[in-house]
Design a protein with these regions (language model features):
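Cytosolic, long alpha-helical scaffolding segments
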Residues: 1-130
Length: 130
C-alpha cells in the first residue's frame, strides 16, 4: 500500500503542476475568469486541499476519523465539480465568458477534483491497513 500511496502523492504533484501551467497559460494570453468562476475555483480548491490534508493526517495519526473526513470532502468536491460545470455552461450561454477562459476553468476544476480523488485513494489504503 505504501507504493500505491507514493504513486498517488506523485500524481497530486502532477495535478499541482497542471494548475500552475493553467495559470501561466492564462497570464501569457491575457485570459481572465469571471468573478463567479474565480469564486468557484476558490471553493472547490479549498475542499480539495482539505481532502488531501485529511489524508495526510490519516496516515500520520492512523486515524479512521480522518479517513472518513477525506470521504466527506471527496464527495463535496465531486458535487461542486458537477455544479460548477453546469454554472460554467450557463455563463457561456449568457456570454459572460468565452471559450478560452472556459477551457482553462474546466481544466482547473478537473485537476482539483483529481487531487481529491487521489486523497481518497490514500485514505482507502490507510483504511485497508487498519
Amino acid at each position: 500500500n505504501l507504493f500505491y500511496s507514493i504513486s498517488d502523492i506523485e500524481r497530486v504533484g502532477d495535478h499541482a503542476e497542471n494548475l500552475v501551467e493553467s495559470v501561466e497559460y492564462m497570464k501569457d494570453r491575457g485570459i481572465d475568469l469571471t468573478e463567479s468562476g474565480i469564486e468557484d475555483i476558490r471553493q472547490i480548491g479549498a475542499a480539495a486541499v482539505k481532502s488531501f490534508d485529511h489524508a495526510v493526517r490519516a496516515r500520520q495519526y492512523n486515524s479512521m476519523d480522518e479517513v472518513r473526513k477525506v470521504g466527506q470532502y471527496e464527495d463535496e468536491v465531486d458535487n461542486l465539480e458537477e455544479e460548477f460545470r453546469e454554472k460554467h455552461v450557463e455563463r457561456l450561454s449568457n456570454g459572460e465568458c468565452n471559450a478560452s477562459s472556459g477551457m482553462v476553468f474546466m481544466d482547473i476544476i478537473s485537476n482539483l477534483e483529481r487531487v481529491s480523488d487521489h486523497a481518497y485513494n490514500l485514505a482507502g489504503y490507510i483504511k485497508d491497513e487498519m
